[in-house]
Amino acid sequence: MEERFYQFLRGHHVLHLATLGEQGLWCAPLFYALDEERIEFVVASDPKTRHTQGALQEPRIAGSVALETKSVGLIQGLQFEGIWKSEDPKARELYFKTFPLARALFPVLWRIEILHAKLTDNRLGFGKKLEFFRENHSL
């Protein structure tokens, strides 16, 4: 993934997740820690929530991270498609390093493996988009 993607994502901490499960479409904002090495988000979410249930039923998910601005010339945002996965020790370590106070809440953590991402950055020119495609991935 190109450095500009990481620069943008390092400046934010909330993604908007979209899922599709037996209850239909749903979306939710989630705090994220960014695993740059594995090109993944690490998020906390209760397994009973509608969006987590949807992701467990259909692990292909989508989402976005956006800069809120009223200036068209400053618009920046990332759209992504990914795979919802269980957490692992590396993900736990990263999440609690990013959000140390969350440890006391004993959250259930998940990983989102980014398969495809599109970064819009109007500072580079109106409608300028950069794309990332993961070559190898696993469900």
From Swiss-Prot:
InterPro entries with a match to the protein in the record: Split_barrel_FMN-bd (IPR012349), UPF0306 (IPR011194)
The source's superkingdom equals Bacteria
Q: Which family does it belong to?
A: Belongs to the UPF0306 family.
What is the official name of this protein in its record? UPF0306 protein WS0399
